[in-house]
Swiss-Prot record:
PROSITE patterns: THUMP, UPF0020. It comes from the Bacteria. The lineage of its organism: Bacteria, Pseudomonadati, Pseudomonadota, Gammaproteobacteria, Enterobacterales. Belongs to the methyltransferase superfamily. RlmKL family. CDD domains: AdoMet_MTases, THUMP_AdoMetMT. This is Ribosomal RNA large subunit methyltransferase K/L. It comes from Serratia proteamaculans (strain 568). SMART domains: THUMP.
Amino acid sequence: MNSLFASTARGLEELLKSELEALGAHACKVVQGGVHFQGDDRLLYQSLLWSRLASRILLPLNEFRVHSDLDLYLGVQAIDWTSIFGVDKTFAVHFSGVNEEIRNSQYGALKVKDAIVDSFTRKIEQRPTVAKQQPDIRVNVFLQRDMASVALDLSGEGLHQRGYRDLTGQAPLKESLAAAIVQRSGWQPGTPMLDPMCGSGTLLIEAAMIASDRAPGLHRQHWGFTAWNGHNVDLWREVITEAQVRARRGLQETTSRFFGSDIDRRVIEMARGNARRAGVAELITFNVNDVAKLTNPLPEGPTGTVVCNPPYGERLESEPALIALHNMLGRIMKSAFGGWQLSLFSASPELLSCLQLRAERQFKAKNGPLDCVQKNYQLAENPLGAGGVQVAEDFANRLRKNLKKLDKWAKQQGIECYRLYDADLPEYNVAVDRYGSKVVVQEYAPPKTIDAQKARQRLFDVINATLAVLELPSNQLILKTRERQKGKNQYEKLAQKGEFLLVEEFNAKLWVNLTDYLDTGLFLDHRIARRMLGEMSKGKDFLNLFAYTGTASVHAGLGGARSTTTVDMSRTYLEWAEKNLRVNGLTGKQHRLIHADCLSWMQNADEQFDVIFIDPPTFSNSKRMENTFDVQRDHLALMQDLKRLLRRNGTIMFSNNKRGFQMDMAGLSALGLEAKEITAQTQSQDFARNRQIHNCWLLTHAGEGK
């Protein structure tokens, strides 16, 4: 009787135990990452050939305590290696784990190699060769705390390498994990299976091998036991022959039918090649198809199981498309696959919620480093039957209400960009902005007290509802996460797409970029202030400080300003401002762009202006500015510099986003300035729900105010 260990992916241990027991294994004991079991030589070979779930089958050789590298060396050397393999064979060591004495796995592997080589040298005065590539013998050593386990790896290469897969599409599943997904899906041999995003076909091929009683290891060319002295060649041939007979008979007798599709023609060709090499090509129909065009391959029955590993994104920009994909898949399942089962494996349970289906069962497993979940659904017999769930219904209703009111208003105003929703409902803490045909959803960073997974689920619900209410293609929705700005964060790029969209605001054309920066190049809440500046600037010299992308300069120029001067510290935004001026025909020497620290420039400038617009940051500590700036603390010093630049009968429009900002009226009076708050007049209908989005003031020389 042999004592053996089968390793597997985390989460599959109990499934592997059942599989080994079905093969005839005894004394099965589940541990994290695998199963200890016992069996005779036939069972040893059968577990290698027939296990669909094991990663490796190991034959333990010794276990001992390790308090030093000498303990490791002596424990390995105590094994009679000459009885395990011949000196003419090559070997390799796989060492995992560390402790206080063995702190590096490479060092541990080196000590094990030395011990094995020295064992041969002392006994027969010859030494075997170490080979990193395709060794004849693989020795596995696992060190945990002060215990080391040494085993012979009978598998060679991992057992998931069945021998049928050549090339793979993006993000392939290991064959052993694919087999587990199939077994957990609820699918029964003899019934149909469909994978609508099949990639290289692994799920379908593993299912077809199960249906046709084909041993998963039948196509493997290399094994870890062929150079082992305990290898029984005749018994192995007998086990192989039995498996070949079963595979031929199973292929003839199976009634299962399999269907796979993918939008990528290249991976479908790979899938067909993989199925041929696996010996199950005649059972699987592959075709190139978009999920959006998915239909039931057996509309008249019988019913079967849809099994799929849909894509899940790690990049923020991919999430709207994935949400739309899952939502669409859910609708197709409900409308065309009544009576079928659905089983999806994903690293994103939040995306699975976008199906708007209730799962009957779910399982957890690891896919490499990723924590994944598999959810099984029973699809109702009637099309679009019961079992669906409404997602973010309150949010959708509010968005619908806002859209009805604001869409008509925006058209009357002659604007393409406006805010549709701004955290109206506390549980849906986002802003939704429309820019022509596109929509930007900005998630306000949730408080640390809110569960991260719950916040992510709500965000996915918001995107799902926004796409539905606005009837928007997923590629027209841009997702961003907004946090409190620190220093120069607002100037840092989020992406490198360089895609600009030309939008209209009253009589102005303006370039926006919805993807590359946190802000888009157009502050929507200042729309009315910009229009007022245009009306104030006719025949006058206009100065725009902290100008950003120069949109206020555009309105002033279109309003008939004699000149515009646009000052900002960012070259990127000045180039953007120049584009905005140029597209509106505002070119020439009378439209100046100045790259400078605005605070320093104001102190050194020796010219005057009729209209000055200044919208400084609430706080800044940019390296390019000599000192920090706080708008509450420093606004009086700011006005002192501006007073010198302001002509008689001139006007300063001063705006900022500081909540609770208090204007120092006494200080202004001492400077010889008067101020009038015009915040209410600058707030448009789409920001009526957020009265504190900004505050705005008009300042004049004392005695000139109206």
